[in-house]
Design a protein with these regions (language model features):
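Membrane-proximal helix-turn-helix segments that form the acceptor-binding/catalytic region
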Residues: 142-145, 164-167, 171-175, 200-219
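A short, active-site helix/loop in glycosyltransferases that binds the activated sugar's phosphate group
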Residues: 211-241
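A conserved catalytic-core segment of Leloir-type glycosyltransferases
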Residues: 42-134, 138
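Carbohydrate-associated surface elements
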Residues: 225, 245-248
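Short N-terminal targeting/anchoring amphipathic segment
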Residues: 92-99, 144-165, 177-181
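Conserved catalytic-core segment of nucleotide-activated headgroup transferases in glycan assembly
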Residues: 250-299
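Nucleotide-sugar donor phosphate/pyrophosphate-binding loop at the beta->alpha transition
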Residues: 176-181, 190-211, 251
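N-terminal subdomain of nucleotide-sugar transferases
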Residues: 1-80, 85, 218, 227, ...
Length: 299
């Protein structure tokens, strides 16, 4: 088997946000270990800021961009040549001309709240199904088949969320026979924030998850806890092809041993959600104020 692997994700540099870095660093270090990653991503970024310097770390990796139109009024307006209202464009404009007053924004948002609620209702239940990347699927499958043929791909790798990534991987596997590795960065239909609260949409998302476990040649999870969750959900049927691959620290960012500080730090990495409230902080404060702290592991 050759070492040509197709990495499929809508989240890749120059985008810079939490969902980017698992696939991004995987690509970087696969290349160093003798693999030949080829990336398939989106050609438009509507929601995230960008850092073009990130691409310097994967300069020699082929990156293909399949056509993606956001299924929103914004996506339609931009497609028809309207103003670029992506987050990166708005942020750049704000830096140039200055942000508007908060009072003006508040009045505007109040006036639009009724329409906004109706608009979101339509999007969540009828348009963005199974998610907002639904209109990326067709072009990604078409381009993916071409890449598989031209680069003699031996493995397809997708990372979820979004659910659409799994649909793309599944279709490419069925169309080409190439082995498919389905990665889960989140416990999808188990975690409330990850799936739709509208049952017909949730049912479609659940079906995608079920088919993923059924047809993927291997399942990988960001956390060992996720694999335990999936093992319980599917009664152990897929445990023989499920693997835990943690998201590690990029060694290039670590200081040399000689330059490391002697002090130890406790660092929280990730999102601290509103739902967490202050439970962790209370426990942490008690631990810090206790008479003894024990450390375990490598420092």
């Amino acid at each position: 088997m050759n070492k040509n692997i197709l990495i499929i994700t809508p989240f890749f540099p120059p985008q810079t946000h939490a969902a980017v870095f698992r696939a991004f660093k995987l690509v970087k270090y696969l290349k160093r270990t003798g693999w030949n990653p080829i990336v398939l991503t989106v050609n438009r970024n509507y929601l995230y800021l960008e850092d073009p310097d990130l691409l310097d770390e994967v300069q020699d990796v082929p990156i293909y961009q399949a056509n993606y139109i956001e299924p929103t009024l914004r996506g339609l307006r931009m497609l028809l040549g309207g103003e670029d209202t992506s987050l990166k464009a708005i942020t750049a404009k704000a830096k140039t001309i200055g942000a508007q007053s908060k009072s003006t924004d508040t009045v505007t948002s109040n006036k639009q709240s009724l329409f906004g609620k109706f608009y979101k209702y339509i999007l969540d239940r009828w348009i963005q199904v199974p998610d907002r990347f639904r209109f990326w699927e067709r072009s990604a499958v078409r381009m993916g088949r071409k890449i598989i043929k031209e680069h003699d791909i031996s493995i397809i790798y997708t990372t979820c969320l979004p659910f659409t990534s799994n649909r793309i991987g599944m279709r490419l596997k069925h169309l080409t026979g190439v082995k498919w590795v389905a990665d889960f960065r989140d416990p999808t239909t188990y975690a409330k924030r990850m799936y739709s609260d509208y049952f017909p949409v949730f049912a479609k998302q659940k079906k995608i998850e079920q088919d993923t476990f059924k047809y993927a040649d291997a399942i990988t999870g960001l956390s060992g806890a996720y694999l335990n969750i999936f093992n319980d959900l599917y009664e152990g049927r897929y445990s023989n092809k499920s693997y835990f691959i943690p998201t590690g620290v990029d060694d290039d960012y670590l200081p040399s041993f000689q330059n490391r500080e002697k002090e130890n730090y406790i660092i929280f990495v990730g999102e601290y959600l509103h739902e967490y409230k202050d439970n962790f902080l209370k426990i942490f404060a008690e631990a810090v104020n206790s008479k003894e702290l024990k450390g375990k592991g490598c420092t």
